[in-house]
């Protein structure tokens, strides 16, 4: 079983304020499994990614954009982490932040089969990442990297998924350019 830190479930729950019925539905799954609500979780405690996925699915269900809402959700991750002081001082630019996000992923997940994100290429303006499957829709990752670029004022960056496990590839690969 793969697990994710509670801070991501809490963030998803907080971003679902526009969709209270869907948040309650996902929160009921969480409460049945843990005895806690989305805003009561230990931010650094680990919880089954199936619970997190129930929040992601409910978020999509509530949004008029459907699964594209995951891009919006992902875009909020690192800007929120930055606002909360969770970015090390030695992160100087978008390239540093993308590389940091690969280490952060490994620290924020645990379980059988989890592996770090592999950096295939990392040059200013051009990054390729090999991302493991955690059962999340890949649009979440697309949003994460667009959100990182936006922190540095880059609004015209591109995140292109070149390979996908769900399409029969052995791994997911994202090409990030700006």
Labelled PLM ranges:
Residues 1-65:
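N-terminal leader/assembly segments
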Residues 1-4, 13, 109-138, 142, ...:
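Short terminal or interdomain "cap/linker" segment that borders an active site or interface and mediates
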Residues 22-25, 94, 157, 161:
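Functionally constrained cores in energy, signaling, and assembly domains
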Residues 31, 149-150:
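Residue-level preference for well-ordered alpha-helical positions
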Residues 36-139:
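Amphipathic interaction/junction segments at domain boundaries or subunit interfaces
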């Amino acid at each position: 079983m793969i697990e994710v830190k509670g801070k991501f479930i809490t963030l998803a729950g907080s971003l679902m304020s526009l969709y209270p019925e869907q948040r309650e539905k996902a929160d009921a799954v969480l409460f049945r499994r843990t005895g806690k609500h989305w805003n009561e979780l230990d931010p650094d405690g680990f919880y089954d990614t199936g619970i997190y996925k129930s929040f992601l699915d409910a978020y999509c269900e509530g949004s008029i954009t459907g699964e594209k809402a995951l891009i919006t959700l992902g875009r909020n991750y690192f800007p929120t982490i930055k606002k909360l002081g969770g970015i090390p001082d030695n992160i100087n630019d978008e390239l540093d932040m993308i590389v940091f996000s690969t280490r952060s992923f490994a620290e924020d997940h645990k379980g059988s089969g989890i592996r770090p994100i592999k950096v295939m290429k990392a040059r200013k303006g051009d990054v390729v990442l090999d991302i493991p499957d955690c059962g999340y829709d890949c649009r979440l990752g697309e949003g994460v990297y667009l959100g990182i670029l936006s922190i540095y004022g880059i609004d015209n960056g591109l995140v292109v998924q070149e390979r996908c496990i769900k399409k029969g590839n052995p791994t997911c690969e994202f090409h990030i350019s700006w």
